[in-house]
Design a protein with these regions (language model features):
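Beta-strand-turn-beta hairpins that frame and shape the catalytic cleft
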Residues: 1-10, 121-125, 129-138, 150-153, ...
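N-terminal, active-site-proximal structural segment of metallo-dependent hydrolase catalytic domains
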Residues: 1-126, 158-164, 201-211, 215, ...
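Structural signal for hydrophobic/aromatic residues that build the beta-strand cores
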Residues: 10, 46, 128, 181, ...
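Catalytic metal-binding/acid-base residues of hydrolase active sites
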Residues: 16, 51-52, 194-196, 249-252
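Eukaryotic basic, amphipathic alpha-helical target segments in cytosolic regions
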Residues: 19, 33-37, 55, 88, ...
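Conserved beta strand-loop-helix elements of the APE1-like EEP
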Residues: 86-91, 119-140, 181-185, 334, ...
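Metal-dependent phosphoester-hydrolase catalytic domains
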Residues: 118, 144-147, 160-162, 172-173, ...
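Extended serine/threonine-enriched, polar tracts that run as long, contiguous segments within proteins
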Residues: 168-186, 196-198, 211, 220-224
């Protein structure tokens, strides 16, 4: 068959366990192609973290290959109504069919639940495709006798399960990790991720080490699941399936790493917040390229040492990362020094309003919470091989949703 490169709309939102109105979904998701409203992307990929609900059988038939619907949770039998799916579906054109809806996690825990067993919602991946795209995938599957979709769940969290329930092993709770879908017809692996967060009083290098350990587990799980579907064998699976990593990867900005500077509203927070309050986009872009930890890690891996001033600044031996992690991270960040938005986290929930709709330079009137240093944990990373075939037409953040301490992000690729 002729090689097929569908246009992509990729989006991510950490929902903070809250719902979303149809108007907000319309504004956010209609960035599918803001300049050509009648030319919609072929694939719509939506990553959600701390999503308040998970998919259920009302979405469609789960027995067939498309749509693929799955939830990994101890509470599947007592789920609340899934308003999120209906909100998103109603915001899209009738040209779209549901391709996959996969989630893992637990519903948001009630207030007062101890932190060691408290859940904030599900990690979720929802994929819609235009009808002719689905037809292409079906034709490919029949010709090559391959599955249309390969779902992968990779829990990496440390939460304790609910009492008397042990559906997941120790240190593999589904509050952190990735839900993934590989599409053999396109040779792509889409991962919706939520990695380890940050606590005060410790430098980011400590948490980066945890995040890279989590990425290694995710990469290993993906390799095992994909090895029999790639002609190059287990050690090459993540080279054959080109990664699209999207979600709350939780890498942060850090100027002052000393523990005494990491307190709530402390020196590190103030140094970053002062730049943001000036409202100068050039200064914000310089802040991103100089102090965003993920930007530095990816630069170091790409340029063999350039990024951090010293490898010790990274907090881990990047050269010693397993090959599968390096394969997973052969990606291009859609946020670059020249198009990055103002930080997407951490805002005061429910306060302020946006001063512009969506653009690379949009700045919210919402205040950043002193709880954490303002950062760009929400990211869209696309395989470098794919970026040679795709142009990133636009990317940005939607500051109109105030129900979460994050704002949604998006990228349009064609």
């Amino acid at each position: 068959m002729e090689e097929f490169h569908p246009s992509l709309f990729i989006a991510s939102f950490n929902m903070n366990g809250k719902g979303m109105s149809k108007n907000d979904a319309l504004t956010w998701l209609h960035q599918i192609n803001p300049s050509k409203c009648n030319s919609l992307s072929d694939l719509v990929i939506i990553s959600l973290q701390e999503c308040p609900s998970a998919p259920n059988s009302l979405h469609g038939e789960t027995g067939g290959n498309i749509p693929f619907i799955k939830t990994f949770s101890s509470c599947h039998s007592t789920m609340v109504d899934d308003e999120i799916h209906e909100t998103i579906k109603s915001s899209l054109s009738t040209q779209y069919l549901l391709l996959a809806d996969i989630a893992m996690g637990e519903p948001p825990s009630p207030g007062g639940t101890e932190k060691s067993s408290r859940f904030y919602g599900y990690i979720r991946l929802i994929i819609f495709a235009k009808k002719d795209t689905v037809a292409h995938l079906n034709r490919f599957g029949k010709i090559h006798q391959s599955p249309l979709l390969i779902p992968i769940l990779s829990p990496v969290g440390k939460k304790r399960p609910r009492p008397n329930i042990s559906i997941y092993p120790q240190n593999r709770s589904p509050d952190k990790g990735a839900v993934c879908v590989a599409i053999p017809a396109l040779n792509i692996l889409i991962c919706s991720m939520h990695l380890c967060g940050t606590n005060a009083y410790l430098p980011e290098a400590h948490f980066d080490e945890i995040r890279f350990t989590e990425l290694d587990i995710i990469a290993e799980d993906c390799e095992k699941a994909l090895s029999k579907y790639t002609p190059t064998g287990l050690d090459r699976a993540l080279s054959y399936f080109k990664p699209i990593l999207v979600g709350d990867l939780n890498f942060r900005v850090e100027i002052f790493p000393n523990p005494e500077d990491k307190s709530r509203g402390g020196k590190d927070f103030k140094a970053v917040n002062d730049v943001l309050e000036e409202g100068n986009l050039d200064s914000v872009q310089k802040l991103f390229s100089s102090y965003d930890r993920l930007f530095q890690h990816l630069s170091y891996l790409e340029k063999e040492g350039k990024g951090f001033d010293r490898e010790s600044d990274a907090g881990i031996e990047l050269k010693q990362l397993p090959k599968r992690v390096k394969d997973l991270l052969k990606v291009q960040d859609v946020f670059t020094q020249h198009n990055v938005t103002f930080p997407t986290f951490t805002f005061l929930v429910g306060e302020g309003e946006h001063t512009s709709n969506i653009s690379s330079s949009s700045q919210s009137t919402r205040k950043y919470s002193e709880k954490r240093t303002p950062s760009w944990p929400d990211r869209i990373l696309i395989s470098k091989v794919l970026t040679e075939k795709y142009a990133i037409e636009s990317c940005g953040a939607y500051h109109g949703i105030t129900s979460s301490d994050h704002v949604p992000i998006f990228a349009v690729c064609s």
